[in-house]
UniProtKB/Swiss-Prot annotation:
InterPro entries: Mechanosensitive_channel_CS (IPR019823), MS_channel (IPR001185), MSC/AndL (IPR037673), MscL_channel (IPR036019). Homopentamer. NCBIfam families: mscL, PRK00567.1-4, PRK13955.1. One of its GO terms (cellular component) is plasma membrane. It is found in: Cell membrane. HAMAP family: MscL. It comes from Bacillus cereus (strain G9842). SUPFAM superfamilies: Gated mechanosensitive channel. This is Large-conductance mechanosensitive channel. GO terms for molecular function: mechanosensitive monoatomic ion channel activity. The chain crosses the membrane at residues 14-34, 38-58, 67-87. Channel that opens in response to stretch forces in the membrane lipid bilayer. May participate in the regulation of osmotic pressure changes within the cell. Pfam families: MscL.
Length: 132
């Protein structure tokens, strides 16, 4: 069971996924800080000194903090746009590599074809000797 787990855990795809999750979490924190500390304060200054973190409405002790929700929407939009652009660039690069791979397969030379025929004839001769 341990060997099966090691095979699963150390496959390229699983390790790649783990690295992606860690990088994604770090990127999410960076974007959250960007939105919270830079974008929404600048937007607040443009809108006349509005502090998005304090935007809320409520009744009594209950409050709906829609300012935080607006910041979370900005987080999502920036992360979604970044992932979209990354995937677009990645797909463009991988499609170019696939095109190059398809073009790289050369036709066999006359010598290679002749050597292949000689190999096949030798195999036939050896198999007929083994039968006899």
């Amino acid at each position: 069971m341990w060997n099966e787990f090691k095979k699963f855990a150390f496959k390229g795809n699983v390790v790649d996924l783990a690295v992606g999750v860690v990088i994604g979490a770090a990127f999410g924190k960076i974007v959250s800080s960007l939105v919270k500390d830079i974008i929404t304060p600048l937007l607040g200054m443009v809108l006349g000194g509005v502090n998005f973190t304090d935007l809320h409405f409520g009744y009594g002790k209950s409050a709906v903090m829609y300012g935080n929700f607006i910041q979370t929407i900005f987080d999502f939009l920036i992360i979604a746009a970044s992932i979209f652009m990354f995937i677009k660039v990645f797909n463009k690069l991988t499609s170019k590599k696939e095109d190059e791979k398809e073009e790289e397969i050369p036709e066999p030379t006359k010598e290679e074809v002749l050597l292949g025929e000689i190999r096949d004839l030798l195999k036939q001769q050896n198999s007929s000797k083994d039968r006899a």
